Amino acid sequence: LNDYLTEMTDILLANKGTLDKYIGDAIVAFYGAPAPVDDHEYHACLTAVKMQDRLAELRKEWESQGDRWPEIVHHMQNRIGINTGPMVTGNMGSSMRMNYTMMGDTVNLAARLEASAKQYGIYIQVAAESQKACADRFIWRNLDYVIVMGKTEPAKVYELIAEAGNMPAGYDKILAAYDEAVSLYQNQQWEKAMEAFRASDELEDMFPGRKTNPSRIYIPRCEHYSENPPGDGWDGSWALTKK
């Protein structure tokens, strides 16, 4: 775990991030404080991609070491949530001990995105404000329009897949099939959308340790709405019932 945290922290610091704290095996970080960072959305997203690339290399290294590590280490994954917006930063704590940290709704949503990424079976979930600031420099999946736990307003979210020009093998077909299914879903064509999501599910990369994927999570939604149509006033959002 210390090796993993060292590798991830090195990437964070090399890409202009500020380390807030470690919470167990989690890394909390931000950009733009205490010193301003130009293009901070790009640096945050680049950090996330580089972390995933390095973790993939580490998995191979750990697996090559055989029985030194349990099999769960060979398939170690992480999740990252990214959001952009105002936050409060500064020294916070008691008169005996303080920590330079951050707080606010922006931070809360980023934490919710990290947690809910597991429901989609993805590594990196990014809010729209961050995505649109560097949209042309990365490959994205138009993931969802959701109300996360603890919020009342829906948020547009994306899966960050890779840097532009580095499309993973087969992902062009996956994204095309997925986008077609989402379009049918948003137009309330539930039966056709269900068939389309099942087709895109067949294309999804079910790598070791992955239990679901974005295509698969839409299928029960289509079944639900087929039996309980949301009506003409539906904004396309879905309320998550767990973090």
What name fits each language-model region?
Residues 230-243:
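Intrinsically disordered, low-complexity, charge-biased linker/tail regions
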Residues 87-89, 116-192, 198-231:
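Cytosolic regulatory/linker segments at or just downstream of nucleotide-handling modules
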Residues 1-47, 97-100:
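Catalytic NTP-binding/metal-coordinating core of nucleotidyl cyclase/transferase enzymes
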Residues 30-40, 80-100, 117-120, 161-164:
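Catalytic strand-loop-helix junctions within cyclic-nucleotide turnover domains
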Residues 8, 44, 51, 82, ...:
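Hydrophobic, well-ordered secondary-structure elements that form the walls
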Residues 4, 23, 40, 47, ...:
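Helical mechanochemical/support elements of P-loop NTPase systems and associated helical scaffolds
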Residues 53-86, 109, 114-145:
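A short beta-strand->alpha-helix segment at the C-terminal rim
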Residues 7-8, 25-27, 48-55, 78, ...:
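Cytosolic nucleotide-binding catalytic cores of signal-transduction proteins
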